[in-house]
């Protein structure tokens, strides 16, 4: 059996066992929950949630306890879940992801993409922040917004932040994930429309990250203090100075007004210039536009060097962003995140982070899969659906050579 798979499994399970040694840190009622001897201890509970699939909780319990007559009931399982804080799985996700050693980079950068995706849950009106009422012909539902940073080269999620429908904010989520990122390598971030805010640029620059972000309006003629050329393709440099004061207020206080000055309105969030601040913030970037094969054009903003990343390179680079869209689909349908086993917010959060852990575990398993095995005239890749299934069974205790199975089910690259 492959040593890497064994090591990954032992790393994950040892983290769960270590968390079980301090149940009060993850219990809703510390000192009372998880103190009595039960069949469903904290480590067993986390293990069961982690390996749940679309089958009912009762069937999962029967499988774990090998069809014993004293198998805990589904009701007992739910009662134990309600004692566990979602923070347990969030911490497990971060610890396990930090333990991984991805090797692939893009020109020396960790190539990340940021995006958000909605997750629909059963109706639970008690949670007003996520509840959306239906109509006379349709029941209401609850909606969660999942924000994530995804490593496009290595196929793993590096961070996740879950928000509720009525309190969501992708800009705020991005800034929070950037600020708390533990990545030590240079980072290059790709993002779609909606992330082109000054505050986002500033947080990225403060961390020393590079970015390539699509602008909201591809046909716009004015952006970030400059008039854009009336051309299907261009590459220009912009440099503006941001401030909170009006030009009159700056004159009254004896502050010289820069030529490329842009005032930020009080309702525009910018963490480095609080409302009323007299400080200035200089922002510079490249704005590029290129034509697509269908004749349309896209406009992007970046702080990448023009010599290292000319216009054709940016066009190819931005196309890589689609990888995070594919990953969300795999997360929901291959890993099975859409098969929620509860409608309560705390239990849904448990399952969301469990799905991300299983996703990263499955991807890390595939890193050493030999895709050149056998004879084929096509380039091939691992069947991720098979990888998830085998990883889940491997975590459940199956003694299998995962990589031998994966070699037999390679798919041609389309």
Which residues does each predicted region cover?
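Single, function-defining residue in the core of a domain
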Residues: 1-55, 63, 68, 72, ...
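Extracytosolic and intramembrane catalytic regions of membrane-associated proteins
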Residues: 132
């Amino acid at each position: 059996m492959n040593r890497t798979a064994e090591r990954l499994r032992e790393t994950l399970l040892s983290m769960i066992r270590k968390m079980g040694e301090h149940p009060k840190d993850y219990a809703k009622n510390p000192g009372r929950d998880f103190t009595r001897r039960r069949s469903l201890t904290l480590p067993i509970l986390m293990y069961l949630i982690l390996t749940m699939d679309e089958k009912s909780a009762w069937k999962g319990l029967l499988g774990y306890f090998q069809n014993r007559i004293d198998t805990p009931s589904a009701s007992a399982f739910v009662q134990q879940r309600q004692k566990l804080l979602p923070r347990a799985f969030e911490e497990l996700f971060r610890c396990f992801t930090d333990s991984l050693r991805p090797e692939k980079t893009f020109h020396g950068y960790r190539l990340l993409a940021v995006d958000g995706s909605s997750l629909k849950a059963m109706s639970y009106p008690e949670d007003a922040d996520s509840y959306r009422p239906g109509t006379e012909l349709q029941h209401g539902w609850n909606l969660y917004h999942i924000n994530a940073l995804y490593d496009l080269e290595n196929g793993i999620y590096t961070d996740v932040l879950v928000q509720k429908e009525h309190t969501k904010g992708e800009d705020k989520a991005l800034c929070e994930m950037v600020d708390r990122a533990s990545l030590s390598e240079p980072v290059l971030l790709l993002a779609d429309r909606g992330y082109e805010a000054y505050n986002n640029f500033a947080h990225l620059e403060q961390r020393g990250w590079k970015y390539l972000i699509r602008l909201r309006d591809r046909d716009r003629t004015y952006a970030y203090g400059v008039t854009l050329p009336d051309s299907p393709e261009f590459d220009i440099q912009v440099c503006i100075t941001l401030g909170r004061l009006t030009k009159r207020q700056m004159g009254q206080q004896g502050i010289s007004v820069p030529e490329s000055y842009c005032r930020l309105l009080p309702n525009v969030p910018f963490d480095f210039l609080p409302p009323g601040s007299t400080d200035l913030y200089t922002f510079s970037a490249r704005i590029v536009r290129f034509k697509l094969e269908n004749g349309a054009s896209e406009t992007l903003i970046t702080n990448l060097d023009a010599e290292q990343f000319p216009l054709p390179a940016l066009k190819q680079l931005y196309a890589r962003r689609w990888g995070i869209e594919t990953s969300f689909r795999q997360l929901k349908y291959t890993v099975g995140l859409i098969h929620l086993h509860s409608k309560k917010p705390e239990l849904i959060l448990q399952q969301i982070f469990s799905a991300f852990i299983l996703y990263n575990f499955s991807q890390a398993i595939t890193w050493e899969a030999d895709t050149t095995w056998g004879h084929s005239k096509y380039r091939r890749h691992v069947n991720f659906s098979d990888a998830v299934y085998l990883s889940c069974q491997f975590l459940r205790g199956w003694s299998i050579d995962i990589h031998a199975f994966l070699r037999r089910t390679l798919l041609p690259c389309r």
